[in-house]
Regions:
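N-terminal Sec/SRP start-transfer signal
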Residues: 1-32, 301, 305, 388-428
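Membrane-proximal extracellular/periplasmic loop immediately following the first transmembrane helix
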Residues: 47-90, 104, 214-218, 452-494, ...
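Short beta-strand boundary microenvironments
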Residues: 93-138, 177-180, 186, 449-453, ...
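Small-residue-rich transmembrane alpha-helices
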Residues: 269-274, 279-281, 305-337, 345-372
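Alpha-helical transmembrane segments
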Residues: 16-21, 26-54, 252, 323-330, ...
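A short beta-strand structural signal in non-transmembrane regions
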Residues: 55-62, 134-135, 183-233, 242, ...
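Peri-transmembrane interface segments
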Residues: 15, 37-38, 42-45, 50, ...
Length: 537
């Protein structure tokens, strides 16, 4: 009998109960959907790193001779190491794309992830294994030839394979934060493909046991002055950028569902309070004919319970199957992973269970007061609340308000919770709108700040390291440019060490360092300026 009554009540108040179902569904749908996307990113990238054995760290030096490599290998935590020569080149296309060449001594660490063609062969001096994203943008395929120019030397190789690299999950040029795969790429070659007899290796990839910070300290202690810098895995540009992206998605997935869940619970509380108030007589009759308070309470608690259970289950199923597929196409245009698939986490179930339990608690608070009344009092209509005059009604402007304004104020005063729900709902919706537009404005301001306020140049030329000062002056005069120096450095604050980029400026107007308020930062000859993020680290 009570089940039929519940169904009739739900049909009678279908709009309110539909809202409860939809809010419960949306809350779990967004949490499980965005969570499935962010957890999927983490699972996919970790599987990718494991499959390719991403390096634990990179040691940079201008001279990685056999003696230095042996000393690194003899350090107790070191499990494996291999040298590479990493250098910039220009591919033979009309837009002069920049291709980072990797000449490999071995291929055991940060290995090439093959998509098409044959596996990387360290003994093959005629082949090149090319970035698939770049190859697709240029309509290149396995078997085609491609030419690269570096340091005045041109080499032509046959494309033996197309694929990805774990070091290039994120890869953008210095002048852009959004990758343009038509202008940048990477290529893996054997050390035998290098045109000179001696390969000037400049990067040593290492796998090691233990903490990266401890390994950094050990390098500094044993090999101080024999290398330029050490970058641990978490500080690598590609790794850190993708990690920050995952953190942003996790934060978004944690915040946005809260709004829907709170609104669902508020709607449930006000709806149940209104239904119970209207059904006082029915509740009194149920008590009079022998129904226990426990039975009546469960009857009304079940109104929201089954709707929230249905919405939560549907959200758990639909969310991870649909929302990630909306994010991944845009993500794949910026980041490179061999696989994009959502993942599941028990956290989604815990949130759904928590929401169901909260709906039970909310319904309980709505029905508990009337359950304590005896049948005779429950059958009688509830006496209206007596609203006393507040301080606002004693102010002079009160009489100047219209009748509708005074009515609305007194009605909100008598139904404080309903008014609170309205305020919270408006705050939540406004916060979502402001956050969305704020994010858009923030990205627009970032672009304006980076490319109008700080950098004023159209292009940047990378000078050969062997060029003399007079040759550099001639180039600068020829292109009407200014000279700057960029280098990788290691900052030691006593408590921690961090890898950073050093930028040395002459009296140039093409680069203007600024603070957060876009004010120009003046740096004296005996001063140095560091970024706020580096200062925080």
């Amino acid at each position: 009998m009570l089940s039929k009554k519940m169904l009739r009540d739900i049909a009678k108040h279908k709009t309110q109960f539909l809202s409860i179902f939809l809010m419960a569904f949306l809350g779990v749908f967004v949490f499980a959907g965005v969570g499935g996307e962010s957890v999927g990113l983490e699972v996919n990238v970790n599987e990718y790193y494991d499959a390719t054995n991403l390096a634990d760290g990179w040691i940079y030096s201008a001279n990685l001779d056999d003696d230095f490599v042996d000393k690194v290998n003899n350090l107790n935590p070191t499990k494996d190491r291999e040298r590479q020569l990493v250098m910039d080149s220009v591919a033979d296309f009309s837009n002069d794309p920049q291709i980072t060449l990797h000449f490999l001594e071995k291929n055991n660490i940060s290995t090439f992830y093959l998509i098409d063609g044959e596996e990387f062969n360290v003994s093959d001096e005629n082949g090149v294994w090319l970035d698939k994203k770049f190859a697709d943008s240029k309509d290149l395929k396995v078997g085609d030839n491609i030419s690269f120019t570096f340091n005045g030397i041109e080499i032509e190789k046959e494309i033996k394979g197309l694929g990805y690299s774990p070091e290039y999950v994120y890869h953008a040029s210095d002048a852009s934060v959004i990758p343009d795969f038509n202008k940048i790429g990477f290529a893996y070659l054997s050390y035998k493909a290098f045109p000179l007899s001696d390969v000037p290796y400049n990067v040593l990839l290492v796998d090691f046991d233990g903490n990266a910070g401890d390994y950094d300290d050990l390098l500094s202690d044993k090999l101080d002055g024999k290398y330029n810098s050490f970058i641990q895995q978490s500080e690598h540009v590609s790794v850190s950028q993708f990690s920050e992206e995952m953190d942003q998605h996790k934060m978004m997935g944690d915040i946005f569902p809260v709004v829907f869940i709170l609104i669902a619970l508020l709607i449930l509380l006000t709806t149940m309070t209104r239904i119970i108030s209207h059904q006082r007589t029915q509740i009194g009759i149920l008590k009079a004919v022998g129904f226990k308070n426990r039975t009546i309470m469960f009857h009304y608690i079940s109104y929201g319970l089954w709707l929230v259970v249905a919405g939560s289950i549907l959200g758990l199923i639909v969310g991870p199957l649909t929302l990630p597929n909306l994010f991944y196409p845009s993500m794949s245009s910026t980041y490179i992973l061999p696989e994009w698939k959502p993942a599941w986490s028990m956290t989604f179930v815990y949130v759904a269970i928590a929401m169901i339990l909260m709906s039970v608690v909310v319904s309980y608070f709505a029905v508990r007061s009337i359950s304590k009344e005896n049948p005779a009092d429950t059958i009688r209509p509830k006496s209206p609340k007596v609203s006393s005059s507040g301080f606002i009604e004693k102010l002079g402007f009160w009489k100047k308000l219209s009748f509708n304004a005074r009515w609305n104020y007194r009605d909100a005063k008598r139904n404080k919770f309903r008014g609170l729900m309205t305020i919270v709902g408006v705050i939540g919706c406004t916060a979502l709108l402001v956050s969305a537009f704020g994010m858009y404005d923030g990205m627009s301001n970032l672009k304006e700040w980076e490319y109008s306020q700080i950098n004023h140049y159209d292009s940047k030329l990378v000078i050969d390291e062997k060029a003399s000062l007079s040759e550099i002056d001639d180039v600068a005069h020829e292109v009407n440019g200014d000279k700057i120096m960029e280098s990788a450095i290691e900052i030691d604050s006593g408590n921690s060490k961090k890898s950073a980029s050093l930028l040395v400026l002459n009296d140039t107007k093409l680069v203007t360092p600024t603070d957060y308020d876009w004010n120009k930062v003046h740096i004296a000859d005996d001063e140095v300026s560091i970024s706020q993020k580096m200062a925080d680290l």
